[in-house]
Amino acid sequence: MAIKTLGAKAAAALDQELMSTGAFSIDQLMELAGLAVSQAVYRLQPLESGRRILVACGPGNNGGDGLVAARHLRHYGYNPTVFYPKRSKNDLYQRLAKQLEDLDVPFVDDFSSAVSSTDHIVDAIFGFSFSGEVREPFPAVIQALQETKLPVTSVDAPSSWDIENGPPESGLGSSFMPTALVSLTAPKPLVNHFRGRHFIGGRFVTPAIASKYGFEVPEYKGIDQVVEVETTGQKL
């Protein structure tokens, strides 16, 4: 199946349509996205290969997806740690954080130190709406992500990448190539610059909505919420 992509404007319009015509709530979409991410990590990082997962969360919806993923990973038997330096005051995000606290999932302030004691990193900092410069406190985090030898799974977009054009030509993030990418709902144009393992998580989009936005819903197997698709990188 040829991969069709959605630009930032189309992706935003699709999200709005899912919450209007599709009758989904933001809570539902975030839960489904985080579940998909957790299933991708489960494939990439089997429990016997290391249970320590560091989830880096940004202040927006991408970070919310990361919080949901961390909860599911905890229930799978992993030991997630969450880096969430810019906590939102929004009730939804506060509830997601409370759910993790109730599961004794630790929140850390020092990302660099946390990297030294983890087995896999989930990059849930910036999503498809990111543009401009990376602001504090995230430049050091992006630098650590591009320097680490650990596997990194990015949620919808490798943080610092332009949604249309991929990694910056120079400077921060220019050499950041995560191990895996989980495209949510549908891949974004940046996937054309990606060279790792690629998963799609969107097992809630109706054929009618997919057709309207010009992409196909991939064939998901069994009860899977993600499907791995071919890239020029490693494939399952």
UniProtKB/Swiss-Prot annotation:
- Which InterPro entries does this entry report, sorted A to Z? YjeF_N_dom, YjeF_N_dom_sf, YJEFN_prot_NAXE-like
Q: Which residues form the YjeF N-terminal domain?
A: 11-217
**Which EC number(s) does UniProt give?**
5.1.99.6
GO molecular-function term, one example from the UniProt record = metal ion binding
Top enzyme category: isomerase
Question: What reactions does this protein catalyze?
Answer: (6R)-NADHX = (6S)-NADHX; (6R)-NADPHX = (6S)-NADPHX
Q: Which UniProt keywords apply?
A: Cytoplasm, Isomerase, Metal-binding, Mitochondrion, NAD, NADP, Nucleotide-binding, Potassium
Q: Which domain of life is it from?
A: Eukaryota
PROSITE patterns reported in the protein's UniProt record? YJEF_N
Q: Where in the cell is it found?
A: Cytoplasm; Mitochondrion
Offer a single GO CC term for the protein: mitochondrion
Provide the primary localization.
Answer: cytoplasm
Indicate the family of this protein.
Belongs to the NnrE/AIBP family.
Give a short account of what the protein does.
Catalyzes the epimerization of the S- and R-forms of NAD(P)HX, a damaged form of NAD(P)H that is a result of enzymatic or heat-dependent hydration. This is a prerequisite for the S-specific NAD(P)H-hydrate dehydratase to allow the repair of both epimers of NAD(P)HX.
Give the protein name, as stated in the record: NAD(P)H-hydrate epimerase
Report the source organism.
Fusarium vanettenii (strain ATCC MYA-4622 / CBS 123669 / FGSC 9596 / NRRL 45880 / 77-13-4) (Fusarium solani subsp. pisi)
Traced from the root, the source organism's taxonomic lineage reads: Eukaryota, Fungi, Dikarya, Ascomycota, Pezizomycotina
